């Protein structure tokens, strides 16, 4: 039987995609819209405080295309905290006009495919930085879920640990070419959501998403074993831009 990869697990992650009921939003009196925006910004301010204390992180992006209008990406130490944040958002006045589009629940993950020493990895600063990341404030985001194929001779889970390690090492070398251009956060979701992993990419140049994903398609681990869900691409919605975004 093949050996399962051991994982290092960090913060829990929620990707919460919503569409905006603009028609209903436009019917609200201006004063009520402003009050709803102020209430939402107060909630975001709480998220900012948590992030400054390094007890979690968040990102808010508007989504390009028809799959969704807005994304709230939240990182927290526990699943319960994610649920509390989702509930708090749903209780706001603004949420009356935010319709569920898609969501993804996962946990920040590092695997043991790369060789490690005897030191406790959770005490290594670089490992901790990757397991408990402060999300980049880049102009653009790209998210997609993915699986490893389990069909015939292309069954990832029947490969030996050494075979999988070698394939992942080559895959990682491709990713390193984009260091400084793209920041990647991998979250594991086996038993938590419909796919096995979520991939979130951050960059100030959206074209780098296309270049990176395309080049990786030629890696054997992706060409033979990668299966992908829908891609979501968006632009950053800073606190300063929230009032103008919701202005009608």
UniProtKB/Swiss-Prot annotation:
Entry's EC annotation: 1.3.98.5
Active site: 144
Catalytic reactions on record: Fe-coproporphyrin III + 2 H2O2 + 2 H(+) = heme b + 2 CO2 + 4 H2O; Fe-coproporphyrin III + H2O2 + H(+) = harderoheme III + CO2 + 2 H2O; harderoheme III + H2O2 + H(+) = heme b + CO2 + 2 H2O
InterPro entries according to UniProt: CHDC (IPR031332), ChdC/CLD (IPR010644), Dimeric_a/b-barrel (IPR011008)
This protein's pathway: Porphyrin-containing compound metabolism; protoheme biosynthesis
GO process annotations (BP): heme B biosynthetic process
GO molecular function: heme binding; metal ion binding; oxidoreductase activity, acting on the CH-CH group of donors, oxygen as acceptor; peroxidase activity
Top EC class, one word: oxidoreductase
Binding site for Fe-coproporphyrin III: 130, 144-148, 171, 184, 222
Record keyword Heme present: yes
Keywords: Heme, Heme biosynthesis, Iron, Metal-binding, Oxidoreductase
SUPFAM superfamilies linked to this entry: Dimeric alpha+beta barrel
Cofactor(s) listed: Fe-coproporphyrin III
Cofactor note: Fe-coproporphyrin III acts both as a substrate and a redox cofactor.
PANTHER family named among the record's database cross-references: COPROHEME DECARBOXYLASE, HEME-DEPENDENT PEROXIDASE YWFI-RELATED
Subunit structure: Homopentamer.
Family: Belongs to the ChdC family. Type 1 subfamily.
Task of the protein: Involved in coproporphyrin-dependent heme b biosynthesis. Catalyzes the decarboxylation of Fe-coproporphyrin III (coproheme) to heme b (protoheme IX), the last step of the pathway. The reaction occurs in a stepwise manner with a three-propionate intermediate.
Protein name in the entry: Coproheme decarboxylase
């Amino acid at each position: 039987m093949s050996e399962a990869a051991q994982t290092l697990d960090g913060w829990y992650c929620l990707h919460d995609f919503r569409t905006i009921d603009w028609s209903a939003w436009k019917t609200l009196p201006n004063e009520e819209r402003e009050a709803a925006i102020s209430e939402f910004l107060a909630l975001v301010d709480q998220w900012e405080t948590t992030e400054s204390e390094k007890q979690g992180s968040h990102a808010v992006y508007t989504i390009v295309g028809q799959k969704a209008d807005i994304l709230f990406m939240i990182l927290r130490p526990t699943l319960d905290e994610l649920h509390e944040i989702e509930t708090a958002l749903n209780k706001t006045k603004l949420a009356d006009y935010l319709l569920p589009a898609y969501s993804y629940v996962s946990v920040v993950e590092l695997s043991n495919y790369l060789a490690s020493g005897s030191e406790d990895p959770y005490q290594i600063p670089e490992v901790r930085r990757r397991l408990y990341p402060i999300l980049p404030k880049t102009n653009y985001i790209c998210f997609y879920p993915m699986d490893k194929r389990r069909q015939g001779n292309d069954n990832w889970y029947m490969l030996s640990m050494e075979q999988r390690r070698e394939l992942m090492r080559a895959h990682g070398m491709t990713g390193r070419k984009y260091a400084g251009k793209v920041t990647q956060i991998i979250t594991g979701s086996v038993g938590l959501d419909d796919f096995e992993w979520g991939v979130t990419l951050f960059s100030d140049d959206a074209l780098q998403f296309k270049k990176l994903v395309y080049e990786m398609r030629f890696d054997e681990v992706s060409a033979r074993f990668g299966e992908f869900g829908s891609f979501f691409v968006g632009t950053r919605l800073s606190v300063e831009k929230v009032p103008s975004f919701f202005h009608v």
